[in-house]
């Protein structure tokens, strides 16, 4: 009895001695745990609460010792070796921590979980037991405190795959992308994850099998406003002629060519996607549709001017011959030089005709005729020479345009003195050798001179029109002459 008591006391002493020698202060915890100053121990971090969208692809997040698991929403959970229960799937991304969870065996061994979950370290898990069921995987584990990290720098800890011990004796993630220990292809981008890594395709590419292939953004409308050009890993937008890309590099806006680079020679009008040039009056667009060429209006029509058309840059003007003036821009009107200026002497009278003027003597009477106050040349009865001559001669002047249309009444002759019981007859005494005129009697005392052949000027034509007066009983016979000077102008206006 005394021997047993002695052994017991010795054992207690040894235990007490060992506890005293191995006392170590713990203030740091492994990944997945944090120090609880109240309870003075490491406690598990619920990543399902603090990690946004911890699980992807419709998986549910279940907290795990030192990490978390991503499980199908229909997975079953066995708690403390009880029978499986169908768990109502929680909302995506919500916490589902429990003492027993369903997971694939590969999850527990590798530490990398589908959908993003991971197990922090083997020491923290405290040795979970994985069993495969018919429709589920069962992890049976004994809850254990996480491994605390001693302050002794020489102390070695065991880290999960994808982690390594740091100089502060904590498990830290291995950056496989920086270390070059990943197996991503040359056309892929390595993305470091906690405890692992992922191979992604660069922007503009998508994974097809094990390769990254270009995404043809142009087949996914509406990227570009007008035209899309696909390039390896990207794309760019183009605009049709007359448009340019806006600041967003997507929308096409109209280019105002009239403001930016006006190519029009005269007038520019901007339209959507293009522009048009117009010319001022008197010009027309050339074949290049940009420059303007003068329109030779004089060649387009022969009826613009009455006499002569003169082309000028952008316009035209009309000219008239000497003796005429331009009226209403196109018509020629005779200038009456007798009213403005003339070179006739005092003993001459000025006679205006179409296109000019002429000076005639104020006293045209020739011997034996004498001038009367009525401007008539009368042959005195007392003069024997007058017996075979017309009793009187009257001088008249008229002007007609060249090439006047025929037949045309041009002059009327009428008796100034009417005698009773007399008969008057009219005839062309001279000046009608070529038959240009015809005298038509219109009444017993008058007749009309008719132009029957066109006359071209400039020329002067003198016609003697005679009126014979005979008494009805034949007692006397007399003759009077009207000497008509017809001046034909040089033009038809």
Swiss-Prot record:
Organism: Macaca fascicularis
Pfam families in alphabetical order: cEGF, EGF_CA, Fibulin_C
Location relative to the cell: Secreted, Extracellular space, Extracellular matrix
Protein name stated in the entry: EGF-containing fibulin-like extracellular matrix protein 1
Molecular function via GO: calcium ion binding; epidermal growth factor receptor activity; epidermal growth factor receptor binding; growth factor activity
Region described as Mediates interaction with TIMP3: spans on this chain: 259-493
GO biological process, one term: regulation of DNA-templated transcription
Binding partners and assembly: Interacts with ECM1. Interacts with TIMP3.
Listed InterPro entries: cEGF, EGF-like_Ca-bd_dom, EGF-like_dom, EGF-type_Asp/Asn_hydroxyl_site, EGF_Ca-bd_CS, Fibulin_C, Growth_fac_rcpt_cys_sf, Nephronectin_domain
Keywords attached to this entry: Calcium, Disulfide bond, EGF-like domain, Extracellular matrix, Glycoprotein, Growth factor, Repeat, Secreted, Signal
Disulfide bonds: 177-190, 184-199, 201-212, 218-228, 224-237, 239-252, 258-268, 264-277, 279-292, 298-309, 305-318, 320-332, 338-350, 344-359, 365-377
UniProt GO cellular component terms: extracellular matrix; extracellular space
PANTHER family listed in its UniProt record: FIBRILLIN-1, PA14 DOMAIN-CONTAINING PROTEIN
Span of the signal peptide: 1-17
Superkingdom of this protein's organism: Eukaryota
Chief subcellular location: secreted
Family: Belongs to the fibulin family.
Function of the protein: Binds EGFR, the EGF receptor, inducing EGFR autophosphorylation and the activation of downstream signaling pathways. May play a role in cell adhesion and migration. May function as a negative regulator of chondrocyte differentiation. In the olfactory epithelium, it may regulate glial cell migration, differentiation and the ability of glial cells to support neuronal neurite outgrowth.
Segments forming domain EGF-like: 26-71, 173-213, 214-253, 254-293, 294-333, 334-378
Annotated glycan sites: 249
């Amino acid at each position: 009895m005394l021997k047993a008591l002695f052994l017991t006391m010795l054992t207690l002493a040894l235990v007490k001695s060992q506890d005293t020698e191995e006392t170590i202060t713990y203030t740091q915890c492994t990944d997945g745990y944090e120090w609880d100053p109240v309870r003075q121990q490491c406690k598990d971090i619920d990543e399902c609460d603090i990690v946004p969208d911890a699980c992807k692809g419709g998986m549910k997040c279940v907290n795990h010792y030192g990490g978390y698991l991503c499980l199908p929403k229909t997975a079953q959970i066995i708690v403390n070796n009880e029978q499986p229960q169908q768990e109502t799937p929680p909302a995506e991304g919500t916490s589902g921590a429990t003492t027993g969870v369903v997971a694939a065996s590969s999850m527990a061994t590798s530490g990398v979980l589908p959908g993003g979950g991971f197990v922090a370290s083997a020491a923290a898990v405290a040795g979970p037991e994985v069993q495969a069921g018919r429709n589920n995987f069962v992890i049976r584990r004994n809850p254990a405190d996480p491994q605390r990290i001693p302050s002794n720098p020489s102390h070695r800890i065991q880290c999960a795959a994808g982690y390594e011990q740091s100089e502060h004796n904590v498990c830290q993630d291995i950056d496989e992308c920086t270390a070059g220990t990943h197996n991503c292809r040359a056309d892929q981008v390595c993305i470091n994850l906690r405890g692992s890594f992922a191979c992604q395709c660069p922007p503009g590419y998508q994974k097809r099998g094990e390769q990254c292939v270009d995404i043809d953004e142009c087949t996914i409308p509406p990227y570009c406003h007008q035209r899309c050009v696909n390039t390896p890993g990207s794309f760019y937008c183009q605009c049709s002629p007359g448009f340019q890309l806006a600041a967003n590099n997507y929308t096409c806006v109209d280019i105002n060519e009239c403001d930016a680079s006006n190519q029009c020679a005269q007038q520019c009008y901007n339209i959507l996607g293009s522009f048009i040039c117009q010319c001022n009056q008197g010009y027309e667009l050339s074949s290049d549709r940009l420059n303007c060429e003068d329109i030779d209006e004089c060649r387009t029509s022969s009826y613009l001017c009455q006499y002569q058309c003169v082309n000028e840059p952008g316009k035209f003007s009309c000219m008239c011959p000497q003796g005429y003036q331009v009226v209403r821009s196109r018509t020629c009107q005779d200038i009456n030089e007798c009213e403005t200026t003339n070179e006739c002497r005092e003993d001459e009278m000025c006679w205006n005709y179409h296109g000019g003027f002429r000076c005639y003597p104020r006293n045209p009477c020739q011997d034996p005729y004498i001038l009367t106050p009525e401007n008539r040349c009368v042959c005195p009865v007392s003069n024997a020479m007058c017996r075979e001559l017309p009793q009187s001669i009257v001088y008249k002047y008229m002007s007609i345009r060249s090439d006047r249309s025929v037949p045309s009444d041009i002059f009327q002759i009428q008796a100034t003195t009417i005698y009773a019981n007399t008969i008057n007859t009219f005839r062309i005494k001279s000046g009608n050798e070529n038959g240009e005129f015809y005298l038509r009697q219109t009444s017993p005392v008058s007749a009309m001179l008719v132009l029957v052949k066109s006359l071209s000027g400039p020329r002067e034509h003198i016609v003697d029109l005679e009126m014979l007066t005979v008494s009805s009983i034949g007692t006397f016979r007399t003759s009077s002459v009207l000497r008509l000077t017809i001046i034909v102008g040089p033009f038809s206006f």
